[in-house]
């Protein structure tokens, strides 16, 4: 069972979005996933949501066109409307400074972007499943 029921996933890779959603639905079929292809699309989706329908958590891929994960994180944490939404950034970057900077900007966590189905499952179980 998920501790977060409504999730926004911003990732420009359609295959990664599909894998994430498939695994999430296996774990909790009632979970709602809203997908965005980049940070700008995520902002547009959030802006259309009523306050009582905002997501419980936002997961951001760092390497997106138009608005990166870090740029999206800065926007979210500077916005009074969105600053309290839990946010995770994932990235293929393996640079400690990047991880630390995102944490200082307000990310709940920063993780290596999953590269296998099992790695996606482990990430979802670590961050989204109620223990």
Model-derived regions: residue spans:
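Active-site beta3 strand of CheY-like receiver
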Residues: 52-60
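Two-component/phosphorelay signaling modules centered on CheY-like receiver
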Residues: 14-38, 105
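Alpha4 helix (beta4-alpha4-beta5 surface) of REC/receiver domains from two-component response regulators
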Residues: 71, 94-111
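Active-site residues of response regulator receiver
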Residues: 11, 60-61
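Helix N-cap/capping motif at the beta->alpha junctions
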Residues: 35-47, 69
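Receiver (REC) domain active-site loop signature in two-component systems and cognate sites
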Residues: 64
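Short amphipathic alpha-helix used as the core "switch/output" element in two-component signaling
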Residues: 44, 70-83
């Amino acid at each position: 069972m998920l501790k977060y029921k409504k999730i926004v996933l911003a990732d420009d890779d359609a295959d990664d979005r599909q894998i994430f959603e498939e695994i999430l639905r296996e774990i909790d079929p009632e979970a709602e996933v809203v997908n965005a292809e980049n940070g700008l699309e995520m902002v547009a989706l959030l802006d259309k949501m009523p306050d009582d329908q905002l997501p419980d958590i936002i997961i951001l891929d760092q390497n997106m066109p138009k608005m990166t994960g870090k740029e999206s994180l800065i926007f979210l944490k500077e916005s009074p409307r969105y600053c309290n939404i839990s946010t995770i950034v994932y990235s293929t970057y393996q640079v400690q400074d990047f991880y630390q900077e995102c944490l200082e900007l307000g990310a709940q966590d920063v993780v290596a972007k999953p590269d296998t189905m099992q790695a996606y499952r482990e990430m979802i179980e670590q961050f989204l499943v109620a223990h």
